[in-house]
């Protein structure tokens, strides 16, 4: 009977059944084989709904979808261009920063490629950058902001990790702060490589004038305060994360619907439905995955995995190397939400056993995922960019390779220099 269930689950996975159904079948089979009541799965679904922090997830997601429906991306690029366009290769640096900020606000790298790609790619080409460089930049920069507040994957990692008792506690705010330096490191390395690559070239600069800065800031006057209000409220203790998410949603609605009038009241319904369909899928997978995690804990799978790994891998450095290889492969094959709900419950106890703090693991996890998004042959952003820019995949492989190598250097530094993530703890 058990073997028949295993075969059915393998067939379900092979034919592309929804992830939640595969996880549900696996958890039910595990509990059935251990003579545990199957009601435990329903209990886990309720437990995840009863998590106050989870309120932030749909609210931040809705805000991101709403921003992507407006002209926020154009105003954001104009602000960055007015401030940094005078630098050598300034437009490329503008693109890096704008993509990182927009991904953080919307929570999805694919949205950044679609929304900013149409704006940045022609601008980079007209600015004198090669087509290969421009395409590679937009494709890879789409995932940079995953480490920056209020990134939805960052919140989701915190929610999952806090459900697992590993003897190390942390707050979501600590997780937000931990992502700042690693993101800045990536931006600095990418910008430095861009400057070196185009040294002595004829890339034109945009003349810096206070008039241009003032005009760009004025156009974006209702959106610029948003991150300062949210971050200031969270870090000062005025807002909890869930309250900050509510403030963000209300602020974005007021700015885009009432002040800018770029999203109509009628459109709010469709944006809400579209964003909540995504959130509903995440919550369904998350609840069932936590039920599956409960079975794994009862069966002592993480402990057995820990013992097995320590038999062959003695040092934390060796574990981190293996972890990076595994996560890069997963990032190329799974979307970030599926990877989080499946792997964090397995990896977190093992990582803590090697002396790795949960906050550091979270930054390593998401940094790997962002590189995995454009890792050949099946990184998700490669397919999105191929469709959006009508480029063959092989051309994108070549275009993204230099950026990938730079980010792998940053990833190694983030992995092996914990203070980059834990300086505030």
PLM regions: where:
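Alpha-helical transmembrane segments of multi-pass membrane transport proteins
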Residues: 1-425
């Amino acid at each position: 009977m058990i073997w028949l269930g295993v075969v059915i689950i393998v067939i379900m996975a092979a034919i592309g059944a929804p992830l939640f159904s595969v996880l549900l079948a696996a958890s039910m089979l595990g509990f059935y084989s251990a003579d545990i009541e199957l009601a435990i799965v329903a209990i886990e679904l309720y437990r995840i709904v009863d998590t106050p922090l989870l309120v932030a997830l749909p609210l931040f997601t809705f805000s991101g979808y709403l921003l992507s429906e407006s002209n926020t991306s154009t105003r954001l690029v104009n602000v960055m261009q007015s401030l940094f366009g005078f630098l050598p290769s300034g437009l490329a640096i503008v693109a890096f920063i704008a993509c990182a900020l927009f991904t953080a606000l919307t929570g999805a790298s694919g949205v950044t490629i679609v929304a900013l790609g149409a704006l940045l790619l022609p601008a980079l080409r007209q600015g004198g950058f090669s087509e290969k460089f421009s395409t590679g930049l937009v494709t890879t920069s789409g995932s940079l902001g995953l480490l920056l507040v209020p990134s939805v994957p960052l919140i989701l990692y915190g929610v999952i990790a806090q459900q697992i008792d590993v003897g190390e506690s942390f707050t979501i705010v600590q997780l937000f702060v931990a992502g700042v330096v690693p993101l800045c490191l990536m931006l600095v390395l990418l910008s430095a490589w861009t400057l070196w690559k185009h040294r002595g070239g004829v890339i034109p600069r945009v003349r810096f004038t206070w008039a241009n800065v003032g005009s760009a800031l004025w156009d974006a006057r209702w959106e610029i305060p948003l991150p300062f209000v949210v971050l200031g409220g969270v870090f000062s203790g005025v807002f909890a994360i869930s309250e900050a998410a509510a403030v963000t949603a209300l602020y974005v609605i007021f700015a885009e619907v009432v002040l800018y009038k770029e999203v109509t009241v009628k459109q709010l319904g469709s944006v809400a439905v579209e964003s909540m369909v995504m959130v509903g899928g995440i919550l369904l997978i998350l609840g069932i995955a936590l039920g599956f995690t409960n079975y794994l804990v009862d069966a002592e799978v993480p402990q057995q995995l820990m013992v097995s790994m320590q038999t062959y891998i003695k040092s934390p450095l060796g574990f981190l190397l293996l972890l990076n290889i595994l996560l890069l492969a997963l990032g190329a094959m799974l979307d970030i939400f599926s990877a989080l709900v499946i792997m964090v419950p397995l990896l977190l106890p093992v990582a803590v056993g090697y002396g790795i703090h949960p906050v550091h693991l979270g930054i390593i996890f998401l940094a790997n995922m962002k590189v995995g998004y454009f890792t050949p042959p099946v990184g998700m952003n490669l397919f999105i960019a191929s469709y959006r820019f009508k480029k063959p995949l092989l051309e994108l492989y070549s275009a993204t390779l230099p950026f990938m190598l730079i980010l792998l250097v940053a990833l190694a530094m983030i992995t092996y220099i914990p203070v980059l993530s834990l300086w505030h703890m």
